[in-house]
Amino acid sequence: MDGLGRDVQGEGALLRGQGEAVRVVLPGGVGAWAVTDPAVIRELLTDGRVSKDAYRHWPAWQRGEVGAEWPLAVWVSVQNLVTSYGAEHRRLRGLMGSAFTARRVGLLGPRVGEIAAGLLEGMEAAAREARGGVVDVRGLYAQPLPSRVMLELFGIPEEFRGALREIIEGFFATGVSLEDARRNYAALYRTMGELVAFKRRRPGEDLTSALIAAGSGADPADPGAPSDLADLTDVAGGVGAGGPEAPGGGGLSEKELVDNLIMLLSAGCEPTVNLLANAVVLLLREPGQLELVRSGRASWRDVVEEALRVEAPGANAILRYAVEDVRVGETVIPRGDALVIGFAAAGRDPGVHGEDAERFDVMRATRREHLSFGHGVHYCLGAPLARLEAEIALQALFDRFPGMRLAVEPGALRPTESFISNGPREVPVLLGPPTDGVR
């Protein structure tokens, strides 16, 4: 698979055409099975014989055949809610869910609107100064909006924010060198450790403080920031060791706290950036679809769901592992083999969405039948927040700039350099005359 993600959808279509489970080679020469069929994905993601815990269920990782030198090691070496399995996952999910409540998310709606309004003011000002009036909607709106929402949700002070935004963007780049991956992870771990220490001294009404409270009574020893990925196995408990012991009483250890904060923050930013950027491109490329919303025949929720389907913000999810032999159609995936779940390819499956599955259609009957937030026990905790942000942000943008158009041909847009993260690197637009934003 192309680590630079130069044609995520083309690669997905190729894999779909080759069967329900296809052998692939990941960046760095690691073999895996790619699964793109929606029905098969749903089965696998609810099958107890499929795990996300490399320390327990991936022999290649346990034996050191794949290790810290692998450029994608950070995706499997961290131990958090996303990479947990079984009882451990249920424990962490309960703790995360107790902090990431529907009430806390719901209260963010007005603040999302305020952040959007401020960013739109800034983008309009930037357009007045820009050559030809061209501005990048991704860089000036889609990227900072979810970042600011998450930074506020986490109660992150201003002095941490700039560094975290840069680090998180680098985290999703799968075409980077090993040295860059090591440096980025070390910086992320160090910064989040500093944040936890700050919040212990000055707790507030925020997600970080809530998770610290959930982990109270856990081992207070600070493992320190790993200097590079080679230190991850020691910090996490050693290759094959199963990771850190759960603290007494089922709380969070210091390592678990930092790892899960990293997971929540990164998962809450980059995918929503892609969702917003993709939706903007799709609407500007298909103005008839935007008119359906403006005429009241479709809603902004319809736009969000169809954008999630046709351009999944997370193209591929790595990795899962067969706990025992698993049959997929005529293929048997042997115990211990790794799997890649192709969410972007699944979203365009013609067997589910029709022969025009690649077309953006906000009235499509199957627009909600996507897997872009996952499925089963690992369904994304932040899905309600991502939907809330996208609906508010898209309506605010198109209400404010009803004449906005792409400044380049759609084919000239460059993808992010990743086969995991799926979205454009920039979205250059001409805003057109603004309105007062009231409709």
Tell me the role of every PLM-derived stretch.
Residues M1-R439:
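Cytochrome P450
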